[in-house]
């Protein structure tokens, strides 16, 4: 070293250091002044807009903070930060870095640009859904395995079917009384997303449900909302109409009705009676400045990407019934091109008014018996259904490196259009065949390695045989044995979910691959004779059976989804690769564990505690360390919290069932400091408890002791 070139150490800080939380009260004071509220009434974690903020008031916030803190700020503060906590973190980074913090996009761009993965396999790392009779993939699978029919009469909280029912087709009337319906499509935890109650009330329930499913999906993948903030996540949502918007139009038309000259000739009693009858039969809603934005279809993914600060592609897809399977294809391709590091894909469809039933009845497309009899001799039309499903995708290699839960692997997918057919709503078997055949050739796959096909099958006498013929024709060149591939359709269980139909079939297949069981095909007393299964590679499952696979082969399924207008999608999905069994190094390293749970409200936290207890009672084989780690590290930190120290799953169940949440909600995370004590903190026997209680600790200490024994007069194990 050349001594003259060394500089003396500076005793002054090169720049001021701001700890987390340093600006909280100053920011809250500014917000209070601009919003006209007392500071104590402004939570640190609630968004500015949800408390009555506007764009003009946001500019006032920016100016007031510059005056208060004596620093220059840009509009980035308003764009990147919605809460006091986020503004505090931003300002702390700005002070500590001596300039504006890099945007999330700048932080991520270097990692993603040019990181496409070619034609690589794509992993499914999480799924979330709401289907008729099921609010989770696990409940959905249970229903499928039991052969449950989740179709029933139109609920009274939708519309009174008796007001519209006619056994014969008649314009404006409905001849099908049944459908697959969600229990509560209107429920929404607005506070969790910082959305005001007034705005939530006018928002399309499809937007609400997708936001909640994305939140659930992230946690099912093993991440917290904070960990996904600002990342290049793509969002692709299949969605068509918005039946909730009809209520907004009805409200507007109800107001317009009062301006009619003829209306003014009625008595006040008659006018009131008409207004009340209108409200009862057609429904009315409130109003909000964001009403239009909150009900546009493209805003389902766009609002969600904005809410979670996702920076990847965000788009709504409408190819009718094939929409949600098409989103999976687009999402996988987007990942392969490097447009996003991971992607969320799926679809949603709700039936909040009778309108779709009225038009489908006019087209005589529905089942008059209200029974979804896919592949059956008595098939007489489709039964509408509603639901939503989303999955998270990631390159398989990256998912394995990151330790993500790989549920299945998307091997290949393709889309095309029928071109000419006998009618705009009629399928073209040749178009379907061409897609299927070309996909296997292009990806060097063989249908002979597929053991199950999840068909589009809707329960029509002509459509089902047409699809089977297209599959049979496409598979012919590979010489499959007759009746060697099982075939089914989830529409028999939950109805035809239109834009969400494909994702329902996809989630069914992934669950079946995970459990290595093929579920039964219900509502088939005798197969449609036009199918001629005995002359094809396909057969129906009357009961659930183990998923057969040849030695050295992987379980594979194919999925069909076809849309009105001719957009077809076909996909091949494979079971997840086997994970290495847990070795001794992965055994628990401590006798006791700390677990923390949080929620937006105390009631939600208590519900979460009971739900986790119920889950552990059913799945007691989950390692306690994994359960605690997931809840501690991969869950979004919310204000109301519960903590416990536990040494077994059974002990944890008891504490969850009887425990009491912390008395006061946490407004923000406290600042932390680390201390390194140096010498003088050691003492004889300091490792005895760990040595006696933890095999992994004991094994490594014994190895160290044996290594030093030739050079010491005593054993290390005797000291510690």
Pin down the residues of each PLM region.
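Phosphopantetheine-dependent thiolation modules in NRPS/PKS and related acyl-activating systems
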Residues: 1-112, 533
């Amino acid at each position: 070293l050349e001594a003259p070139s060394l500089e003396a150490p500076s005793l002054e800080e090169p720049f001021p250091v701001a700890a987390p939380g340093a600006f909280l009260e100053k920011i809250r004071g500014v917000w209070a002044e601009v919003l006209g509220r007392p500071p104590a009434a402004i939570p640190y974690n609630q968004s500015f807009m949800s408390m009555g903020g506007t764009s003009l008031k946001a500019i006032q916030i920016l100016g007031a903070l510059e005056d208060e803190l004596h620093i220059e700020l840009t509009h980035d503060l308003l764009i990147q930060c919605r809460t006091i906590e986020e503004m505090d973190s931003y300002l702390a980074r700005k002070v500590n870095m001596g300039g504006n913090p890099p945007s999330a996009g700048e932080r991520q761009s270097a990692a993603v640009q040019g990181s496409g993965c070619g034609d690589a396999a794509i992993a499914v790392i999480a799924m979330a859904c709401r289907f008729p009779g099921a609010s989770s993939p696990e409940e959905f699978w249970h229903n499928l395995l039991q052969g449950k029919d989740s179709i029933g009469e139109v609920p009274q909280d939708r519309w009174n079917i008796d007001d519209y029912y006619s056994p014969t087709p008649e314009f404006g009337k409905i001849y099908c009384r049944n459908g697959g319906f969600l229990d509560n499509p209107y429920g929404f935890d607005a506070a969790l997303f910082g959305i005001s109650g007034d705005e939530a009330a006018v928002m399309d329930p499809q937007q609400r449900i997708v936001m909640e499913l994305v939140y659930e999906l992230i946690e099912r993948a093993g991440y917290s909302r904070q960990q996904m903030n600002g990342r290049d996540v793509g969002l692709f949502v299949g969605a068509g109409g918005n039946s909730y918007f009809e209520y907004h139009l009805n409200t507007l038309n109800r107001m317009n009705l009062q301006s009619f000259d003829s209306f003014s000739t009625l008595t006040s009693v008659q006018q009131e009676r008409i207004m009340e009858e209108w409200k009862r039969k057609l429904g009315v809603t409130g109003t909000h400045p964001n009403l239009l934005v909150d009900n546009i279809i493209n805003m389902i993914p766009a609002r969600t990407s904005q809410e979670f600060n996702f920076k990847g592609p965000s788009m709504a897809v409408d190819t009718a019934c094939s929409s949600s399977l098409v989103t999976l294809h687009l999402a996988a391709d987007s990942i392969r091109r490097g447009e996003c590091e991971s992607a969320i894909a799926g679809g949603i469809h709700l039936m909040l008014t009778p309108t779709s039933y009225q038009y489908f009845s006019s087209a005589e497309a529905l089942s008059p018996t209200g029974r979804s009899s896919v592949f059956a001799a008595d098939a007489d039309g489709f039964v509408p259904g509603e639901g939503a499903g989303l999955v998270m995708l990631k390159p398989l290699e990256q998912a394995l490196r990151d330790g993500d839960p790989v549920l299945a692997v998307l091997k290949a997918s393709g889309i095309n259009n029928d071109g000419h057919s006998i009618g705009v709503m009629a399928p073209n078997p040749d178009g379907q065949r061409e897609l299927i055949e070309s996909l296997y050739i292009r990806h060097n796959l063989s249908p002979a390695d597929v053991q199950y096909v999840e068909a589009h099958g809707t329960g029509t006498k002509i459509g089902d045989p047409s699809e089977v013929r297209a599959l049979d024709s496409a598979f012919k060149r590979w010489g499959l044995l007759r009746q060697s591939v099982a075939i089914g359709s989830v529409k028999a269980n939950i109805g035809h979910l239109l834009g969400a139909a494909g994702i329902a079939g996809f989630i069914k297949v992934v669950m079946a691959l995970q459990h290595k069981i093929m579920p039964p095909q219900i509502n088939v007393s005798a197969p449609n004779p036009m199918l001629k299964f005995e002359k094809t590679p396909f057969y129906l499952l009357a009961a659930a059976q183990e998923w057969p696979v040849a030695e050295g082969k992987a379980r594979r399924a194919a999925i069909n989804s076809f849309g009105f207008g001719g957009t077809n999608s076909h996909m091949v999905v494979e079971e997840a690769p086997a994970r290495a069994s847990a070795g001794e190094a992965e055994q628990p390293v401590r006798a006791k564990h700390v677990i923390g749970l949080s929620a937006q409200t105390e009631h939600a936290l208590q519900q979460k505690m009971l739900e986790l207890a119920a889950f552990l009672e059913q799945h007691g084989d989950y390692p306690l360390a994994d359960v605690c780690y997931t809840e501690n590290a991969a869950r979004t930190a919310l204000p109301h919290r519960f903590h416990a120290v536990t040494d077994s799953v059974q002990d944890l169940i008891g504490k969850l069932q009887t425990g009491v949440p912390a008395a006061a909600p946490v407004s923000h995370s406290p600042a932390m400091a680390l201390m390194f004590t140096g010498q003088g903190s050691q003492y004889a026997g300091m490792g005895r408890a760990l040595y006696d209680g933890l095999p992994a600790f004991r094994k490594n200490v014994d190895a160290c002791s044996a290594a030093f024994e030739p050079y010491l007069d005593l054993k290390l194990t005797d000291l510690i």
